[in-house]
Amino acid sequence: MPAARQQRGAAVEAAARALLEQAGLRLVVGNANYRGGELDLVMRDGPALVFVEVRYRRDDRFGGGAASVDWRKRRKLVLAAQLFLGAHPTLAALPCRFDVVDASGEPPVLHWIRDAFRADDC
């Protein structure tokens, strides 16, 4: 991936984290990599564990970032979340949800989609 694209991705993820922390969520870990995929942000929202996918698109011509979280991507996120929970058994009993932060435009405008999908939808 080109350096400029990596920088953009890191900046958008940092902005998404700041947005969520302003809303009261607390970071557990960022960029957790597993064989099946990556978890951009893992956060706590009260008693819930939240797996956050951050997607950036320059424009929403093809549906924007949220539209790019298709069933294949959702399945990878669920698998990565299962691996994360297996590696962190103290968190495994918590209720979980999957959120998406959709970023688009220049400068990016962020939209937080709580409970964007459920693990049993995949």
Swiss-Prot record:
Listed InterPro entries: Restrct_endonuc-II-like, tRNA_endonuc-like_dom_sf, UPF0102_YraN-like
Question: Could you state a single Gene Ontology molecular function term?
Answer: nucleic acid binding
Q: Could you tell me which cysteines form disulfide bridges?
A: none
Q: Supply the SUPFAM superfamilies for this chain.
A: Restriction endonuclease-like (SSF52980)
What is stated as this protein's family in its record? Answer: Belongs to the UPF0102 family.
Matching HAMAP family, A to Z?
UPF0102 (MF_00048)
Protein's recorded name: UPF0102 protein XCV0816
- The organism encoding this protein is Xanthomonas euvesicatoria pv. vesicatoria (strain 85-10) (Xanthomonas campestris pv. vesicatoria)
